[in-house]
A protein has these predicted regions:
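Flexible "arm" and connector segments at domain edges
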Residues: 1-71, 75-117
Length: 117
């Protein structure tokens, strides 16, 4: 299972569950997993902080591996957290997608972007 390409969110969550069981880790709620995910986000955001839009785009293009690795770590950790909480990620996504798409179905820009001077 470890060398098989993961093609669905459900398969990813199953692989992470298998990984945890193989290592004798309990799937119980763990505050450390929330902290781990927060750290992963901070690590990636630090590369883009205080840069203009143009600088951020350039940095990501030139350093794609940083973000590919970070997103992979974040997703693996999210699967682990979902397992600990007994949440099916696909069900959770489908539960919120319509509401989020409707809520942000407007032309306003995203928040917290550095504005050009």
């Amino acid at each position: 299972m470890e060398n098989k390409k993961i093609e669905t969110i459900k398969d990813a969550q199953k692989l992470v569950k298998f990984f945890a069981e193989r290592n004798n880790w309990k799937d119980i709620p763990n505050v450390d997993k929330f902290d781990h995910l927060h750290e992963e986000l901070i690590e990636m955001s630090q590369h883009l902080r205080y840069k203009s839009e143009e600088e951020r785009i350039k940095f990501v293009k030139e350093n794609k591996e940083i973000f590919t690795d970070g997103i992979g770590d974040l997703f693996f950790g999210t699967c682990r957290l979902a397992n600990q909480l007994g949440v099916d990620i696909e069900e959770a996504f489908n539960l919120v997608k319509t509401e989020i798409l409707a809520k942000y179905n407007h032309k306003n820009p995203e928040n917290n972007l550095i504005k050009k001077k």
